[in-house]
């Protein structure tokens, strides 16, 4: 047995499923998950000594690559001053100033510890501000594991929510309406059925939890218009896309202004950080200035703030997003060409520094139904064959992949060459 196999066997006796987040267990592709020893730049190194070109990037935060010296040094310096104080620090103010500078739609920001905390808090705030209970989310979009968000669509195109996990009360889930991503008609139907009851729409501007599905040109502006028409707030969940698709996020890339924005992943530079913010009048409803309660023992943790501040300053440097886009575009084009040479039907979606691979005969993938029609079994084989080639992709056909500026063009070309060898055998 490999060292990873031995560790996984031991972990399953102590940790549910052997992992602390389900996708890490390789249930989407089968086999034994890799246990990682270290990471540097664009590479992961497992406990058995094998190196991999990494396109998971800790599920998005590592936009600068692993073990970036500026972030590492910031963490070390902050740790020498203390780990946590439970009181305000100057770094929290500096971090808030930087975030609100980089994302102009955020007049104010509240720091939390995860993307889930950000989305659940933003929804609570939207409900408190509007005095309404219902929310709209989209099939195939993921916004963390808060009860109100673990809801799937029911039997009809428009239906009251049904729980997607045991432990979520149906009476609570009924306030969540699930619409079809990239389908404005389904959203209008929800508003027309409940015109005075919907507090907010929450949406991934690029759906990254059904692989990578960009919005159609009219979708996000259409959501903005519907929210304005019916008096609801628009929450854009930029946990994945923030500072990655563009410096000011996908909202800037696509030209839409939300009322509230949720951030995570890159904002922490690899440390557990989330944030939500937006219009001043909405944020003023948050405790302690307003009645909507939200709190956190470790929110604004000085080490996490130092890591995030260092990361965002690096990400804001000229050329970062141009490099991300150039590398991702080259990889996407190369994968398409290699698949075409082998006669394998493939769609590769990409926006900025994120991309998704779909085995499908369809010309495009634009919604959850398109994703579910793709060949998952072929993806599983592709994943493991690429892993054998030393390329680590997201271990699920329903998760996006991520580029970093630490990847070199040689890494990209080596990945394309590996895919060409795999496609020939697939």
Swiss-Prot record:
Keyword terms of this UniProt record: Cytoplasm, Isomerase, Porphyrin biosynthesis, Pyridoxal phosphate
Cofactor(s) needed: pyridoxal 5'-phosphate
CDD domains listed in its UniProt record: OAT_like
EC number from the UniProt entry: 5.4.3.8
Pathway membership, UniProt: Porphyrin-containing compound metabolism; protoporphyrin-IX biosynthesis; 5-aminolevulinate from L-glutamyl-tRNA(Glu): step 2/2
Key word Nuclease present: no
Reactions the enzyme catalyzes: (S)-4-amino-5-oxopentanoate = 5-aminolevulinate
Residues bearing PTM N6-(pyridoxal phosphate)lysine: 265
Domain of life: Bacteria
Enzyme class: isomerase
Chief location of this protein within or outside the cell: cytoplasm
Listed GO CC annotations: cytoplasm
Intracellular or extracellular location(s): Cytoplasm
GO-annotated molecular function: glutamate-1-semialdehyde 2,1-aminomutase activity; pyridoxal phosphate binding; transaminase activity
Example GO BP: protoporphyrinogen IX biosynthetic process
Family per similarity comment: Belongs to the class-III pyridoxal-phosphate-dependent aminotransferase family. HemL subfamily.
Subunit structure as annotated in this protein's UniProt entry: Homodimer.
Descriptive protein name: Glutamate-1-semialdehyde 2,1-aminomutase
Organism: Escherichia coli O81 (strain ED1a)
């Amino acid at each position: 047995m490999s060292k990873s196999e031995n560790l996984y066997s031991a972990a399953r006796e102590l940790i549910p499923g052997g992992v602390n987040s389900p996708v890490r267990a390789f249930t989407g592709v089968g086999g034994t998950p890799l246990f990682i020893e270290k990471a540097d730049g664009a590479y992961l190194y497992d406990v058995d000594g094998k190196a991999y070109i990494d396109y998971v990037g800790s599920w998005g935060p590592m936009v600068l690559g692993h073990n970036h010296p500026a972030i590492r040094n910031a963490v070390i310096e902050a740790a020498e001053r203390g780990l946590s104080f439970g009181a305000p620090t100057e770094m929290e103010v500096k971090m808030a100033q930087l975030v609100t500078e980089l994302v102009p739609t955020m007049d104010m920001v509240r720091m939390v510890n995860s993307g889930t905390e950000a989305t659940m808090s933003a929804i609570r705030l939207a409900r408190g501000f509007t005095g309404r209970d219902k929310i709209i989310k989209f099939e195939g979009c993921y916004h963390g594991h808060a009860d109100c968000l673990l809801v799937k669509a029911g039997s009809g195109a428009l239906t009251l929510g049904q729980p997607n996990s045991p432990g979520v009360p149906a009476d609570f889930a009924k306030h969540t309406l699930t619409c079809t991503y990239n389908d404005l008609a389904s959203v209008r139907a929800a508003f027309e059925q409940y015109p005075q009851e919907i507090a907010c729409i929450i949406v991934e501007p690029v759906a990254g939890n059904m692989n990578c599905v960009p919005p159609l040109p009219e979708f996000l502006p259409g959501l903005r218009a519907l929210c304005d028409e019916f008096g609801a707030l628009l929450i854009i969940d930029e946990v994945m896309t923030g500072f990655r698709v563009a410096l000011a996020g996908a909202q800037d890339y696509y030209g839409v202004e939300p009322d509230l924005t949720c951030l995570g992943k890159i904002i922490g530079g690899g440390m557990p950080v989330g944030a939500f913010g937006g219009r001043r009048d909405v944020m003023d409803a948050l405790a302690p200035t307003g009645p909507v309660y939200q709190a956190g023992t470790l929110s604004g943790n000085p080490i996490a703030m130092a890591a995030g501040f260092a990361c965002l300053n690096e990400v804001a440097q000229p050329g970062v997003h141009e490099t991300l886009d150039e590398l991702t575009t080259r990889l996407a084009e190369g994968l398409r060409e290699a698949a075409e040479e082998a006669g394998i039907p493939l769609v590769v979606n990409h926006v900025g520094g994120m991309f998704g691979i779909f085995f499908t005969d369809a010309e495009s993938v634009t919604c959850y139904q398109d994703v579910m029609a793709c060949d998952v079994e072929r993806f599983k084989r592709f994943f493991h064959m690429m892993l054998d080639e030393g390329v680590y992709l997201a271990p699920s056909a329903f998760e996006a992949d991520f580029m970093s500026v630490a990847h070199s063009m040689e890494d990209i070309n080596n990945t394309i060459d590996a895919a060409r060898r795999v496609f020939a055998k697939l």
